[in-house]
């Protein structure tokens, strides 16, 4: 069944206000909603809802009814999300990646798993995160370090992508993990990868933009939060992220270019977090912080 995106183009402030209007109406129906920046200099943002094409008329009508009282000038636009077989396109030449004891591999490399490896099977697909990017590998290394040295009873993987980091946590420690992403395609891919790795019962998957979901209060607070996204949203959501962290908990942040690390550290130092370690990989950094 084909998927579409209905969206409005506006400013950052108005996009957040639109999101606040949409959340109580669409959240219980598991229709993903999100805001995204289009042009920083011009303050152009989009507020979107993702749905199946068969539901367009109903959702469009309710979306329009929400907008009309407060934002009658906003026009609902439509984007058809293409069905692309990224797995078939991406598998060729994809080699296993080692990060600490983890070995991230595709289904075509199962014969390369060693007896002491913690194997995570992820085929390249429509969601980010096969272990080949420096940020994913840096997160896996840091996950291993944190779980070996800290008492961790539950974890959050914010912006899960392929689910590789949530799977890594669950393979190392038998604890509940909440994995979220704003992209419904990513959540679908992550759910398949979790099933493929045989740990479906331990990972809860939710489509959620930022912290706009009741799932965080239901499953949190968290002893470990992993967020491999981008520097700008990491900085913006620092107070919210730390608010969902249990006392004494740990945070792993990535998706950060080396030159952006000081701004990210400043945001989390301001939120009373303590810097523990930074891992550098191919121009990207992964930052580990603890809450005192």
Swiss-Prot record:
Q: Name one GO cellular component term.
A: cytoplasm
Quote the record's binding site residues for S-adenosyl-L-methionine: 136, 159, 181, 228
EC identifiers of the protein? 2.1.1.-
Protein's job: Methylates ribosomal protein L11.
Please identify the protein, giving its name as recorded.
Ribosomal protein L11 methyltransferase
List localization entries. Answer: Cytoplasm
What InterPro entries would the database entry show? Ribosomal_L11_MeTrfase_PrmA (IPR050078), Ribosomal_PrmA_MeTrfase (IPR004498), SAM-dependent_MTases_sf (IPR029063)
- What Gene3D superfamilies does the record tag this protein with? Vaccinia Virus protein VP39 (3.40.50.150)
Q: Which Pfam families match?
A: PrmA
Biological process terms from the Gene Ontology for this record are: methylation
Q: Which GO terms describe its molecular function?
A: protein-lysine N-methyltransferase activity
Which species is this UniProt entry from? Rhizobium rhizogenes (strain K84 / ATCC BAA-868) (Agrobacterium radiobacter)
Q: Which reaction does it catalyse?
A: L-lysyl-[protein] + 3 S-adenosyl-L-methionine = N(6),N(6),N(6)-trimethyl-L-lysyl-[protein] + 3 S-adenosyl-L-homocysteine + 3 H(+)
What family does the Swiss-Prot or TrEMBL record give for this protein? Belongs to the methyltransferase superfamily. PrmA family.
User: What are the protein's UniProt keywords?
Assistant: Cytoplasm, Methyltransferase, S-adenosyl-L-methionine, Transferase
Q: Which gene encodes it?
A: prmA
């Amino acid at each position: 069944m084909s998927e579409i995106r209905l969206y409005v183009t506006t400013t950052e402030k108005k996009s957040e206000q639109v999101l606040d209007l949409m959340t109580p109406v669409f959240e219980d129906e598991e229709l993903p909603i999100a805001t995204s920046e289009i042009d920083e200099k011009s303050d152009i943002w989009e507020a979107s809802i993702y749905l199946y094409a068969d539901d367009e008329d109903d959702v469009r009508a309710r979306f329009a009814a929400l907008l009309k009282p407060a934002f009658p000038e906003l026009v609902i636009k439509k984007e058809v999300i293409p069905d692309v077989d990224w797995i078939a396109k991406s598998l060729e030449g994809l080699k296993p990646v080692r990060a600490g004891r983890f070995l991230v591999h595709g289904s075509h490399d199962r014969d390369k798993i060693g007896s002491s490896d913690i194997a995570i099977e992820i085929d390249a697909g429509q969601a980010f995160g096969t272990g080949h990017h420096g940020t994913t590998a840096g997160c896996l290394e840091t996950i291993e370090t944190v779980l070996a040295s800290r008492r961790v009873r539950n974890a959050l993987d914010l912006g899960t992508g392929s689910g590789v980091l949530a799977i890594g946590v669950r393979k190392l420690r038998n604890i509940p993990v909440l994995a979220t992403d704003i992209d419904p395609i990513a959540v679908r891919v992550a759910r398949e990868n979790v099933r493929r790795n045989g740990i479906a019962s331990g990972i809860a998957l939710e489509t959620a933009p930022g912290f706009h979901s009741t799932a965080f209060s239901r499953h949190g607070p968290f002893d470990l939060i992993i967020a491999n996204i981008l520097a700008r949203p990491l900085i913006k959501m620092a107070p919210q992220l730390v608010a969902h962290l249990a006392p004494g908990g740990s945070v792993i942040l990535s998706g950060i270019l080396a030159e952006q690390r000081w701004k990210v550290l400043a945001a989390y130092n301001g939120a009373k977090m303590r810097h523990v370690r930074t891992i550098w990989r191919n121009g990207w950094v992964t930052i580990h912080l603890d809450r005192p």
